[in-house]
Regions:
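Bacterial N-terminal signal peptides that target proteins for export
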Residues: 2-13
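C-terminal motif of bacterial Sec signal peptides marking the signal peptidase cleavage site
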Residues: 20-22
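Bacterial signal peptide processing site
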Residues: 24-27
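Glycine-centered loop-to-beta-strand initiation motif
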Residues: 36, 77-85
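Short, ordered, surface-exposed loop/turn motifs in non-cytosolic proteins
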Residues: 40-68
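Short, acidic Ser/Thr/Gly-rich low-complexity loop/linker segments typical of extracellular
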Residues: 67-80
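A short, solvent-exposed beta-strand micro-motif common in secreted/extracellular proteins
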Residues: 90-100
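Structured interaction patches on ligand/partner-binding surfaces of diverse proteins
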Residues: 99-125
Length: 129
């Protein structure tokens, strides 16, 4: 009787491990994805000739969607607006999140090729005019 009980426990444990492994999902490849920078501008209320007013790096939250709108992942850039994220090859949409009405940025479709990183530059509009 004890041997039969041990076999049931072992079977239940193996089933648990298999189900847990299945729930973890497919790991993202490490040799393809997206990388780039995020900036916000304009930063000066009135642009003047010979007075530089470059866009500034912007720490943003970005969401990657499938072309049908399903969320793949969400991540945050570093304080200098830089990011590098692993993704499987395919077609996606990058949705820049906005904490308020401004700054805002448009969705950006992109493609990831096998074994390559796609470079993206995202520009948020500050709303300053």
């Amino acid at each position: 009787m004890a041997i039969k009980s041990m076999m049931h426990i072992r079977s239940a444990f193996l089933l648990f491990v298999l189900l847990l492994t299945a729930c973890l999902g497919t790991p993202q490849p490490s040799d393809s994805g997206i990388e780039g920078t995020v900036a916000v501008g304009p930063m000066c209320p009135v642009m003047q000739a010979n007075v530089p007013c470059p866009d500034q790096p912007y720490q943003a939250t970005l969401t990657v969607l499938t072309t049908s709108g399903k969320k793949v992942l969400q991540f945050q850039t570093d304080e200098k607006g830089r990011f590098r994220v692993n993704l499987a090859s395919g077609d996606y949409i990058l949705h820049p999140e906005s904490p308020n009405v401004m700054p805002s940025a448009a969705d950006m479709p992109f493609t990831v090729a096998e074994h390559k990183f796609t470079m993206l530059e995202i520009s948020y509009d500050s709303g300053i005019r």
